[in-house]
Amino acid sequence: MTQKLLYVSPVESFVDTSFFQELSRLKLDIHGLSTSQITIHSYLDLKNIPSVSSACHLFLDQQSFNSEDICASSERVRLEGKLYNCNSLEEFKSLDKQQYLAEQGQKIYTKALEDINSAIGFSIISFADLKKYVFYYWVCTPLFQHENQQISILDGPEDIDASFNDKAKVWFTNHYSNWVAIVLENGDINEYTKGLNTSSIRGLLIRDTSNKQDMPSAFLRNFITIFSLDYPEAKELDVFLMRSSTIKSIKLRIRLSETEHTKLKFSGWERNSLSKLMPRAVDLSALIDPLKVAEQSVDLNLKLMKWRIAPELDLDCIRNNKVLILGSGTLGCYTARSLMAWGCRNITLVDNGRVSYSNPVRQPLFEFSDVGKEKAVAAAASLKRVFPLINAKGVQLDIPMIGHPVKDENNERKHFDALVDLIKSHDTMFLLLDSRETRWLPTLLGKFYDKIVMNAALGFDSYLIMKHGNIDDNFGCYFCNDVVVPTDSLTGRTLDQMCTVTRPGVAMLAASQAVELFVSNLQSRGQENVLGECPHQIRGFVNNFTTLKLQSPAYDNCSACSRHILNEYNKRGWDFVKQALNDNNYIEELSGLRRIKEEVENMELEGGEIKIIDSEDDGFEII
């Protein structure tokens, strides 16, 4: 009888783009620098095999990382595998591929000695360049065979008769997780087991993934190797290759050569599109929706912080925090960009002005083409041009100012209600306005509604950053060191007083430190945290390049955050605000500042000594 060697059809893989997207997410968010192998799953669609393919594809997609997402059936078989993701391209290149294949093959072989249905699996080595969105990978399906063993075809291939074919289909439908069964001499199909009488075995029934009429799948070698160990006396047997595709199921009569079961040899690396034994590379930057690429890429540097430098950093609390920026000028623009860099996704900007010709060179969210546009709206549009998926809104709004009497109550009441709604719907408020009286009402509302308030103010060569607002905090607000109530400081200003006259770098310093203080505060709500300290105030001086960390307590007679003011606002709402705007003496009387001034004056008349702390100087504890 003429014998010919058995040739097999290699396994092919198909890796969907969603697989790499999920891999990049897991690498960034969970695995970090870990190179431990992770378990993944694939499925083989035995029925729908492309006509141009030599075998059904080992399909990998996003669901491969969660076994529960892959449903198995008689025609859709689930397969377990391993993924080894390298930390650098150099590590990927230098990895001993043959040793890795042998190690994975040995593990599968060991499992198969206990259960022949575990004789097949797969492994992937990869490197994900998350900056360029290029993925390098190589798939292997470890195949093993004893070095001196040969498998010869004695007869066939020939078609399986219809009655046995139907019986085999029913058996695999009822045992869809099995790959192999034993066919007895009487034609019965039994689940594979060891210890049967060799003379009672006619052959093996194997689920076949090949799409070639006269050639079985490469997995056959693994099954035959295990069978030859379990039944060493069986030298000839029939192999029934069951197929679910349009290709007919076939039968082969094979012979196993006389050999000692010595060392195993391993193969199984997949060839690339040029039929070379080489890894593949796929550049997804041009294939995936650019918005999806941007969504993952904008947080890349932040997530890399968690790998080694700050593993406990909470990025979600920053991402989900809704930030309201009052003032869309120089401070507002730099603050918004810094918030974006920290991953903040919800930013609302408020202003009542329009972009002037002097703005674009100092305020980075504006260009020459924006001149004349509403500042807040133009700034929000600029943020969306930088990152289209950010939830940025611009609101044109006049904030009612203490010391400026109400002229159009309906209009000012409408702006007041809008401001209250904005503050209530956000978590944090940045006060970046250009006058003290404009900051008074937002400071009051921030304290009343228990919001985080980040305050920043500029001088010519100095700046102040402070956090306040939360009811639980006993720190002073922007007005707690004032002994006078804010009044109209805008009327009668000269040009140099109407414009922000400050050294250009001061705004960048103030905005960046305000955002850093905000982020540190979110990590611990006031205590030392993974990012370091979280001071109450920061005062910077560019003339001598020094910075002071300061702390001052809340003032019982503060014109903005004292209980007298908050209680009255709680009772009267807009009527209270209207009276405060119209009557310069009302807040001074209500807060108790008038009484304190009178007591001071009386002490001076009586010859006593008292030192009045100026609101612009000391009164702080240096920490």
UniProtKB/Swiss-Prot annotation:
Biological processes annotated in GO: autophagosome assembly; autophagy of mitochondrion; cellular response to nitrogen starvation; cytoplasm to vacuole targeting by the Cvt pathway; piecemeal microautophagy of the nucleus; protein modification by small protein conjugation
Signal peptide coordinates: none
Residues of the active site: C499 (glycyl thioester intermediate)
Motif (GXGXXG motif): 327-332
Family annotation (InterPro entries): Atg7 (IPR006285), Atg7_N (IPR032197), Atg7_N_1 (IPR042522), Atg7_N_2 (IPR042523), ThiF/MoeB/HesA (IPR045886), ThiF_NAD_FAD-bd (IPR000594), Ubiquitin-activating_enz (IPR035985)
Subcellular location: Cytoplasm; Preautophagosomal structure
Keywords: Autophagy, Cytoplasm, Protein transport, Transport, Ubl conjugation pathway
Disulfide bonds, paired cysteine numbers: none
SUPFAM superfamilies tied to this protein: Activating enzymes of the ubiquitin-like proteins
A cellular-component GO term for this protein: extrinsic component of phagophore assembly site membrane
The keyword Secreted is assigned to this record: no
Domain of life: Eukaryota
UniProt GO molecular function: Atg12 activating enzyme activity; Atg8 activating enzyme activity; identical protein binding
Homology family: Belongs to the ATG7 family.
Function, in words: E1-like activating enzyme involved in the 2 ubiquitin-like systems required for cytoplasm to vacuole transport (Cvt) and autophagy. Activates ATG12 for its conjugation with ATG5 and ATG8 for its conjugation with phosphatidylethanolamine. Both systems are needed for the ATG8 association to Cvt vesicles and autophagosomes membranes. Autophagy is essential for maintenance of amino acid levels and protein synthesis under nitrogen starvation.
Quaternary assembly: Homodimer.
Domain notes: The GxGxxG motif is important for the function, possibly through binding with ATP.
Record-linked NCBIfam families: E1_like_apg7 (TIGR01381)
Protein name, entry field: Ubiquitin-like modifier-activating enzyme ATG7
Originating organism: Candida glabrata (strain ATCC 2001 / BCRC 20586 / JCM 3761 / NBRC 0622 / NRRL Y-65 / CBS 138)
